[in-house]
């Protein structure tokens, strides 16, 4: 999800130490952990049941998101779940079942047709040779080939010159039914997808206690073989008034999900792509070659893969009214996620040693959040209206994972590794041929633990005069353990102004104008990187010991310590216009924004020739986004039994790569140009003969051709 353009130079998959531009998700007032698990491949957002969501609000401008400070650099999405209403108990149930399939599989020649056209391609394939004057020439006869034999000589007919005689035998044997069979690989890898979705909800209560309980079940069989997603979730919302001035809100949710990825779907997807990219490499004739020859279907159907996720979210809020309009709100929340993975591959998938393998991973993430708010609103002469908020919050995040693997299991029915591992003495198996011993480790294990903390102090003052002139100022101070020793704290201010000019006396004559307001805002928000120890440097155990203790060495993969590695900072400016017409039946919202994000993380190569610590992570890059947003809303039928609301929105964003650490272009990003451009070669037809191919002469007066293929490429900046 990208709010108002690309907010990061990077995308997921480029390492956990960068910002991917993902917004902050807040569920019922509690920030949630939003990430794609490297274990199961599932995103934590998949734990949410859409049927239990009451509303979704997107905070796009800096003023509205500033209260979240260092986590709001990519925008904020507020999700509110359904709550109970006072009155009689209400029950609702929903059930749906659907199916989907590929509209059409790519056409493929098969069997005898493929054999015939493959032969024709071989017969018409030629290879050039280099003449005495240094040019290249295609042979025109077998005699010319014979007279000009070279190390990588010419070829007049690729069929007779092929070095793969087994293919020639298969392609010539038109009477052998084995070579006339046809396999449609796409149909072997895809299926009809089925989706079952069901949920049940109950709500009700009275003025003192209100409740909502919901349960959902979702089961999807993917369109690719051996893929799918299953989820079971329970949500409970409770609101109670145990005392006259005390209100309690509690929420508890529990989710279990299981995702099947088709034996690491990414690798198999690339294999499917290769089938159509080069049909001659993966033929439909049996036996298949290329990726099919590497047992693609066996990996899909015989590999056992379990990707299970467990999540629990709990939040408790106590709101006490000390005096009239003065509220103290205390909240505590827990966000827990655990992902379990087990992958088992049978012996048949190991063509070298015929070992079965089992891999297991457990990853656990927990976030503890405490927030304390003091709010007070008052009016002076019913004209000057104030709303003051003070708060402080504390957050602690922990991440733990362990991973193990084993090989050479007793049989294909045992999918897990015991405490002693698999195999022979000391967990090792001798699979040598007698002349050279080869040992395969039967048991491996690794573990990891991360922790980070965030402390915040913030305040907000809102003022309006007769609901006509509005001013809001926010200030937040955040401190995080992940940043360098010198820059752990940062300040994030914002200011917003508004003028409801429709309330002015001179606008009353425009009876059709229900409401109109001009607004503007400026604010600073931040974003942290994902690796909690990137600024502090890492140590790794050494193989040598001193007095029985293992030594420690700097971890070269983490770079040099940077005590000034700090927040990614975004300055944003917004100007907007809101208009409502004809008793609020038609609404128009128009916005312009400009965002400048600096201090993005970059790996900087250090001067010198130090072998191990030759780079450092620094805040070195900047990008910008600007754009316009238009939203039109029309309530066609508003006060009838059948209601009809129409919405139309339009947006346009322009982004630029503004700055790199060294002042030069960064990889494919060009300073002053949009991010993530698609760049292709510009062509100008085809070469009709070798005489048209550009050439140059070396110092030895040899002719060298600038030739890659038959397509004529247009060269730029060749000087």
Named regions from a protein language model:
Residues 1-2, 9-23, 32-41, 85-225, ...:
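Residues embedded in well-ordered regular secondary structure
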Residues 1, 16-18, 69-73, 227-230, ...:
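Short, glycine-/polar-rich solvent-exposed loops and beta-turns at beta-strand/coil boundaries
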Residues 72, 204-208, 217, 465, ...:
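A generic beta-sheet turn/junction motif
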Residues 118-184, 276-298, 415-448, 543-558, ...:
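Flexible glycine-rich, low-complexity coil/linker segments exposed to the extracellular/periplasmic environment
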Residues 50-92, 195-197, 210, 218:
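A beta-strand signature from Gram-negative outer-membrane beta-barrel systems
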Residues 231, 237-246, 251-256, 265, ...:
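Extracellular/periplasmic, surface-exposed regions of secreted and cell-surface proteins
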Residues 1-30, 55, 65-82:
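Extracytoplasmic beta-strand/coil segments of soluble accessory domains associated
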Residues 3-7, 27-28, 60, 81-83, ...:
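Flexible glycine-/small-residue-rich
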